[in-house]
């Protein structure tokens, strides 16, 4: 705050100085200088363009200050409400206009550079989720998009509005957006149509059925998303990628004449970038092959930076190194932004993503870059960075050292920025300054000196000693510098009037000494006035300088010279980027000022004839190191669509050269260097393939092929780990890691220390890590192309690029097991829990400790001591807890003998923690739920019991509410089943006797507060596994096995299979086929009842727990092994059955028990007769179908019968390659790749004309409904027609659309304390009466109304509207005290929701997670109530109540296709808005009521060898 004393002093000072000025003006030889003191730092300081008017934001006061005289005097803007200014925006396309936004809907605007302000209403608050609230139209300054949010309570819904008249009026845009932009957001951009330039808007649109970022898409409208009569919006989804439908759009950026869109996908953090130069045609940004480089070319989230680009090309720096040693590669695109070529590797970056790169302003083709000279050694972790500075004069084609005389100099750049604005240059022609040093490499900043160049970086000279902040004025005739210091010891400002040859200084006024913060002037560097801001004694000083006081004359023609941007040795102008560029600037010795205020220097350009210097290597070509005149091919050449139908064909392709983008040379007659030449098809590739991964590399021959590979091993079997790609991946490899295993002993398995890797799905294998002693192999829990390998020491190996390279780190403390925890959004964030041991005076003691790393293990710090378990609970999808939140199970009082409790840590700070008030046995996370068991003492009992507690926000834990009398007949053994469908499915054991294990499945409501019975007598085994599995890709379809004879205490269990088509609300028997595969009728027939049905062997009987009935991309296909009858028979008598319609109809396809795999989205099915314990089958063929099981063919893959150990493929069912794992009679282990890509090379196409389309639309059905409504909507999926000879693109989006339906009985399930009776109706649980309204309101004190109970509640999955709403009656009543609110039709308060849901978030019982790594590597169990020694892992699990995971395979498979994403782009909330540079302190809010109530369910992946491949967790 500016104190009145300061203003009074300033007024008197101005008065006396004015008198003195009259007396001494004739003798003034120094610039005018004065200062004003501030209480708070002036943030967001901006000049209004072409003026001396400056405004800044006082972030503490929340006020705006303004100066009309370049900073000599300041006044608070009084027309704005005191303390209400949250954001300050200057209009980028209207120099006199600015906006001040508040935290509310009322905002302010000026159109006269801040002299006057008018109020306007935006209709919503500024968005907390978008980086920019105001999006300006570059062609019409009155057109503005307002990205806002509507917050009635603690929940905020994003909403977007727009104005066409500068906020005189405002209109809503489309709902369900995550940011909108004008296509013409830059002056350089155009659609090519003036009308479209005015109206075209691009929005990232969210999916109403999903809140995941990976379901978002890009929509375009030219009519402001006008809503039609049918309720649809006038919009279209642009074809971003010609090979696939693109979802997962997370960001959009306008870059000069281009628009960039980034998309992400599950399983990987690789990004796909799409580029357009007209908002009509889009292309995926294609980066060259990295096969011939020692660094990657992959684009990952938070690992690329779009550099300062031009109208004709995009430049991107891609981080290719370890995050703690950041380095990158600069790429430059061609003229349409599609094909990128590498400029220079090993650029110097910092962890914030800043790159040491800057173009020289106003001169084309010149930029300075810092590179790491020993980049390869640094990347391998064996050296510190040696940073050197280089300069290019041909836009990155060649680079030269920067020299001052004969000495090389190195300059500090963006990674050590010490001022605002550009680093080295300004619009002043040819003038460049920088802090640096001479020598072999860049030194410390404090040891640098100031250097200056007046010929655009060709030659340099030292200007001043020590590091400085600097600025340019009067088009370069004035250079101003102030020494950069961390101390408050700077008392002068230096300046030069002859391009840095000589320097003078002026003292700061009033003997002031400061620590300089910034030095600035007008954006165009034409002004004679400068502003210095510094700190002294915790106060801030605005020091203004004015060189007009020197009273220099205005330069005339005799004072000016023609300066050539590039000259030869003789000083003659030479060509740069195809033209000679000349500026008019003042001669060095002229004693005058140009005084062309606010007028940018204009160059004179003269084109040159094209030469070899105007060309560079094209996409996937690079310079031959032995002959720099040759560009050699290092990757496939893009070829025209439809080329190379025959392998002997040729096509016209790149010569290897392209003109440097932006080069303006004049082509001469005759052949051109970049003319296309004839190429062999073997040299070509898919061009803009988009990483489809399914396009064949050679033309199809109509045949299936196979290739065998022997393994040098005497083991019995192989572990397999598929590295799953995301849809945004640019690669096409199908990578698998395998190693031999031997006999199993209990929970352990013998392994050989040999590891193989294949990148072509088993066609070729290579040994890897043969010098390492590998113990265990693990996937990253969320990024499936990242693998970790533990060793016998503290060394952990890993790969982040699918096995191309391997790196390592050391664990901070020892551990008995692999105890890494992973963050769902941040690939490099790790938690390690291990033993910390001290040896003091011969006394050794150990305690558990958790450590954290944010750079993938390079550096560790202790997170919390005496912690036995920690997990990242922060997730960008869960807005109600911070991204940095961690929950740990910790011994109280740092004593191993003390009970454990939950500790919640925010921001990785052990001091910032919340300790749960209670004794906790254990905890687990499942999607958005944090679940635990609290030890409590029941009334009248001395022994403590276990109480289920849970939380959504990680801070407030409350008990769950089970059905009435539920615990009277149930044990405390719990198993968490798949909880992906907006609710927790919990198995609770009822019978724990040997051979009779069974229990009940209970299901929570959508916010997890209460549970109802879903199914009784569900089968389980002694390991805690349950016969429960959701059908992959189909919403709410679940298969279970139940015990048909629960009352018989002796004898064998009789098992029956049931299916639910409405998420467990109702269960039916599987209808049996009438005939078997041989056409013979079964002994019984029915529509599926207790006497006759199809029964399938389920999860508890599987040798390989990774097996599932279905695959996520083979929608509606289900395979199983079983029999027709009253109950399930023996496995030896089982046959193989399938359904093609989601389990409604079944048929027998094979006699005997066969294993299956899906391929090509279900259009390929492969069956193999696998050997089991009861069946030592041998064969030399597999069976396959290309028409969804209607017909079957045999394929012989070996000439002798062998034992098939396994049949595998990519788990999603999208690949066209399969692997058969075999053992010969001679005990030789081998694999056989079976490749179906040769059958066709034609990609299937969807067309609106059903007869011409290769696809038909298929909708899942409920067997008891006449229409196709399924969970309140008709979903339409693409299915390839059975007779079409084409392949499905691997990234094909199967969900084609959906329409909501009216509600029916199938959209409801039984409410709390109700259960299905024998008539299929929801009846009260015996012994319980419905709550009265008074009781309901008393038990729910924050509710305002109550409905008379109906016994039904709405299914969390359903989207139905209106119709039969069984959860409501016609009678709604107000709770006492809320009558007035009820009369106002009761608008639910956000705070009511907060106290009713967030804080008392009563939830599930003691619930488990999918892997318990701290007990002998046994998969699928975590121990609850375990008070034994921390490191004692050999106790039998039966001794304690246990949570086990069952059918985790189904967890991954059951994710509904419409919400199948794991990876989200982080959505920011205001913790401190100052992080956005516009200031403000905002409370954190939830995004939507729906996202809170139903929350954000992520997929627990069952990737092979990790979650379900128990081999990966076995003892070695």
Swiss-Prot record:
PANTHER family: SORTILIN RELATED, SORTILIN-RELATED RECEPTOR
Main location: Golgi
Keywords: Glycoprotein, Golgi apparatus, Membrane, Protein transport, Receptor, Repeat, Signal, Transmembrane, Transmembrane helix, Transport
Organism name: Fusarium vanettenii (strain ATCC MYA-4622 / CBS 123669 / FGSC 9596 / NRRL 45880 / 77-13-4)
Region: Disordered, residue numbers: 642-709
Ranges in coiled-coil conformation: none
Family assignment from sequence similarity: Belongs to the VPS10-related sortilin family.
Annotated Gly residues bias: 683-693
Name of encoding gene: VPS10
Ranges facing Lumenal side: 27-1390, 1463-1516
Protein name: Vacuolar protein sorting/targeting protein 10
Record's compositionally biased regions (Basic and acidic residues): 671-682
Transmembrane regions listed in the UniProt entry: 1391-1411, 1442-1462
CDD domains associated with the record: Sialidase_non-viral (cd15482)
Annotated BNR repeat ranges: 108-118, 390-400, 451-461, 495-504, 756-766, 798-807, 852-861, 1137-1147, 1184-1193
Signal peptide: 1-26
Cell location: Golgi apparatus, trans-Golgi network membrane; Prevacuolar compartment membrane
Membrane topology: Multi-pass membrane protein
Glycosylation sites: 311, 336, 917, 1007, 1342
Function: Functions as a sorting receptor in the Golgi compartment required for the intracellular sorting and delivery of soluble vacuolar proteins, like carboxypeptidase Y (CPY) and proteinase A. Executes multiple rounds of sorting by cycling between the late Golgi and a prevacuolar endosome-like compartment.
GO biological process: Golgi to endosome transport; Golgi to vacuole transport; protein targeting to vacuole
């Amino acid at each position: 705050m500016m104190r009145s004393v300061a203003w009074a002093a300033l007024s008197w000072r101005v008065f006396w100085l004015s008198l003195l000025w009259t007396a001494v003006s004739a003798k003034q030889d120094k610039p005018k200088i004065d200062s004003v003191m501030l209480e708070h730092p002036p943030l967001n300081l901006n000049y209004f363009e072409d003026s001396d008017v400056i405004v800044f934001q006082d972030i503490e006061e929340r006020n705006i200050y303004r100066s009309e005289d370049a900073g000599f005097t300041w006044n608070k803007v009084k027309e704005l409400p005191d303390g209400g200014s949250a954001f300050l925006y200057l209009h980028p396309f209207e120099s006199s206009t600015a906006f001040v936004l508040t935290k509310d809907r009322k905002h302010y605007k000026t159109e006269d550079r801040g002299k006057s302000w008018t109020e306007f209403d935006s209709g919503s608050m500024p968005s907390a989720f978008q980086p920019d609230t105001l999006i300006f139209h570059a062609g019409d300054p009155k057109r503005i998009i307002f990205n806002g949010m509507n917050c009635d309570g603690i929940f905020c819904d994003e909403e977007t509005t727009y104005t066409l008249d500068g906020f005189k009026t405002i209109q809503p845009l489309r709902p369900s957006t995550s940011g909108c932009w004008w296509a013409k957001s830059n002056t350089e951009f155009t659609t090519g149509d003036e009308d479209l330039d005015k109206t075209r808007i691009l929005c990232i649109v969210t999916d109403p059925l999903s809140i995941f970022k990976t379901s978002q898409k890009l929509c375009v409208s030219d009519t402001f998303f006008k809503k039609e009569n049918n309720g649809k919006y006038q919009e279209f989804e642009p074809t971003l990628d010609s090979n696939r439908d693109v979802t997962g759009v997370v960001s959009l950026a306008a870059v000069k004449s281009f628009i960039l869109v980034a998309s992400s996908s599950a399983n990987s953090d690789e990004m796909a970038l799409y580029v357009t130069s007209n908002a009509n045609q889009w292309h995926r940004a294609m980066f060259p092959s990295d096969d011939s480089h020692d660094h990657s070319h992959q684009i990952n989230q938070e690992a690329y930076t779009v550099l300062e680009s031009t109208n004709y090309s995009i430049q991107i720096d891609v981080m290719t190194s370890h995050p703690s040693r950041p380095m990158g590669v600069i790429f430059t695109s061609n003229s349409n932004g599609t094909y990128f070529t590498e400029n220079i590797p090993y650029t110097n970056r910092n962890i914030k993503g800043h790159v040491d790169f800057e173009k020289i302003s106003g001169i084309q083709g010149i930029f300075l870059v810092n590179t790491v000279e020993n980049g390869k050694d640094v990347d391998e972790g064996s050296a510190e960075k040696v940073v050197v500075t280089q300069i290019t004069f041909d836009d990155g084609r060649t680079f030269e050292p920067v020299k001052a005389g004969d000495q090389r100099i190195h300059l500090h750049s963006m990674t050590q920025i010490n001022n605002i604005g550009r680093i080295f240059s300004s619009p002043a022609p040819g003038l460049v300054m920088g802090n640096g040093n001479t020598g072999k490499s860049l030194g410390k900043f404090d040891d640098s000196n100031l250097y200056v160049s007046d010929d655009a970086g060709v030659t340099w000279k030292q200007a001043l000693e020590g590091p400085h902040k600097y600025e340019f004025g009067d088009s370069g005739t004035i250079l101003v510098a102030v020494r950069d210091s961390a101390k408050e010891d700077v008392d002068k400002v230096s300046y030069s009037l002859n391009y840095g040859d000589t320097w003078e200084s002026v003292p700061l006024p009033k003997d002031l000494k400061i620590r300089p913060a910034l030095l600035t002037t007008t954006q165009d560097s034409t002004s004679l006035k400068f502003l210095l801001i510094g700190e002294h004694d915790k106060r801030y000083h605005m020091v203004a300088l004015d060189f007009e006081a020197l009273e220099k004359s205005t330069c005339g023609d005799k004072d000016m010279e023609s300066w050539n941007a590039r000259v030869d040795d003789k000083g003659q102008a030479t060509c740069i980027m195809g033209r000679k560029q000349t500026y008019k600037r003042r001669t060095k010795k002229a004693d005058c000022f140009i005084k062309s205020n606010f007028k940018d220097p204009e160059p004179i350009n003269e084109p040159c004839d094209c030469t070899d210097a105007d060309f560079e290597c094209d996409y996937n070509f690079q310079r031959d190191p032995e002959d720099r005149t040759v560009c050699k091919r290092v990757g496939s050449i893009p070829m025209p669509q439809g080329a190379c139908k025959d392998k002997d064909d040729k096509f016209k392709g790149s010569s290897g050269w392209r003109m440097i983008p932006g080069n303006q040379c004049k082509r001469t007659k005759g052949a051109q260097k970049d003319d296309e030449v004839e190429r062999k098809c073997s040299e070509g590739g898919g061009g803009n393939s988009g990483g489809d991964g399914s396009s064949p590399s050679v033309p199809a021959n109509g045949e299936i092929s196979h290739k065998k590979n022997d393994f040098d091993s005497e083991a019995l079997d192989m572990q397999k780990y598929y590295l799953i790609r995301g849809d945004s991946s640019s690669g096409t490899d199908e990578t698998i890691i395998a190693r031999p295993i031997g006999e199993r002993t209990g929970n352990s398995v013998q392994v050989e220390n040999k590891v193989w890797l294949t990148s072509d799905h088993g066609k070729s294998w290579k040994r890897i890590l043969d010098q390492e002693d590998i113990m265990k192999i693990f996937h990253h829990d969320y990024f499936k192309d990242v693998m970790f390998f533990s060793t016998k020491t503290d060394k952990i190996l890993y790969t982040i690029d699918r096995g191309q390279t391997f790196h390592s780190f050391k664990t901070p403390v020892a551990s008995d097991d692999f105890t890494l925890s992973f963050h769902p959004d941040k690939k490099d964030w790790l938690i390690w829990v291990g033993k910390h041991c001290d040896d003091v005076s011969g006394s050794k003691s150990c305690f558990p400790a958790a450590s954290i790393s944010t750079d993938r293990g390079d550096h560790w710090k202790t997170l919390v001591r005496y912690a036995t378990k920690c997990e990242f609970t922060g997730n960008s999808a869960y807005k109600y807890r911070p991204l940095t939140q961690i929950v740990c199970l910790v011994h109280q009082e740092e004593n191993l003998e003390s009970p454990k409790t939950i500790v919640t840590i925010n921001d990785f700070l052990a001091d910032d923690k919340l300790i749960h008030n209670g004794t906790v046995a254990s905890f687990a996370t499942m999607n958005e739920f944090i679940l635990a068991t609290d030890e409590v003492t029941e009334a009248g009992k001395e022994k403590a019991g276990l109480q289920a507690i849970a939380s959504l926000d990680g801070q407030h834990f409350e008990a769950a509410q089970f059905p009435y009398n539920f615990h009277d007949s149930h044990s405390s053994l719990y198993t968490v089943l798949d909880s992906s469908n907006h609710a927790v499915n919990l198995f609770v054991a009822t019978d724990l006797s040997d051979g009779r294990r069974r229990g009940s499945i209970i299901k929570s409501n959508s916010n997890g507060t209460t549970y109802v019975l879903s199914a009784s007598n569900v089968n389980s085994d002694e390991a805690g596994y349950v016969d429960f599995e959701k059908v992959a890709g189909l919403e709410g379809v679940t298969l279970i096995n139940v015990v048909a004879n629960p009352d018989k205490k002796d004898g064998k269990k009789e098992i029956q299979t049931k299916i639910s088509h409405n998420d467990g609300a109702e269960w039916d028997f599987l209808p049996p086929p009438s005939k078997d595969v041989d056409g013979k009728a079964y002994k019984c027939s029915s529509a599926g009842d207790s006497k006759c049905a199809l029964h399938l062997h389920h999860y508890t009987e599987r040798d390989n727990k990774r097996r599932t009935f279905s695959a996520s991309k083979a929608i509606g296909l289900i395979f199983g092994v079983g029999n027709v009858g009253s109950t399930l028979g023996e496995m030896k008598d089982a046959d193989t059955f399938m359904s093609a319609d989601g389990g409604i109809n079944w048929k027998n396809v094979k006699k005997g028990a066969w294993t299956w795999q899906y391929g090509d989205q279900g259009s390929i099915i492969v069956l193999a007769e696998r050997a089991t314990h009861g069946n030592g089958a041998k064969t030399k063929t597999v069976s396959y179908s290309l028409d969804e099981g209607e017909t079957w063919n045999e394929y012989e893959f070996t000439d002798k019968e062998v034992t098939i150990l396994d049949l595998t493929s990519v788990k999603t069912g999208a690949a066209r390659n399969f692997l058969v794992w075999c053992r010969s009679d001679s005990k030789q282990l081998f694999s056989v790749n079976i490749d179906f890509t040769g059958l066709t090379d034609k990609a299937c196409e969807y067309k609106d004309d059903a007869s011409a389309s290769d696809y038909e639309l298929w909708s899942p059905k409920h067997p008891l409904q006449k229409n196709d409504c399924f969970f309140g909507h008709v979903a339409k999926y693409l299915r390839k027609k059975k007779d079409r000879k084409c392949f499905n693109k691997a990234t094909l989006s199967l969900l084609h659309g959906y329409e909501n339906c009216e509600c029916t009985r199938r959209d409801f399930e039984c409410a709390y304390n109700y259960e299905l009776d024998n008539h299929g109706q929801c009846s009260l649980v015996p012994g319980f009466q419905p709550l009265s309204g008074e009781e309901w309101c008393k038990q729910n004190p924050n509710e305002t109304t109550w409905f008379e109970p109906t016994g039904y509640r709405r299914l969390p999955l359903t989207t139905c509207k209106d119709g039969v709403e069984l959860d409501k009656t016609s009678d709604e009543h107000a709770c006492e005290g809320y009558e007035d609110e009820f009369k106002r039709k009761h608008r639910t308060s956000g705070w009511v929701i907060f106290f009713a849901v967030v804080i008392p978030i009563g939830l599930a019982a003691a619930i488990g997670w999918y892997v318990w790594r701290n007990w002998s590597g046994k998969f699928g169990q975590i121990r609850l109530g375990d008070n034994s020694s921390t490191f004692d892992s050999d106790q039998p699990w039966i001794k304690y109540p246990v949570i086990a995971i069952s059918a985790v395979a189904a967890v991954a498979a059951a994710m509904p296709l419409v919400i199948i994403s794991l990876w989200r782009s982080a959505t920011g909330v205001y913790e401190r808005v100052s992080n956005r540079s516009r200031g403000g302190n905002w409370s954190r809010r939830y995004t939507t009521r729906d996202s809170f109530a139903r929350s954000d369910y992520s997929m627990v992946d069952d990737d092979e060898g990790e979650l379900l491949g128990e081999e990966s967790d076995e003892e070695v």
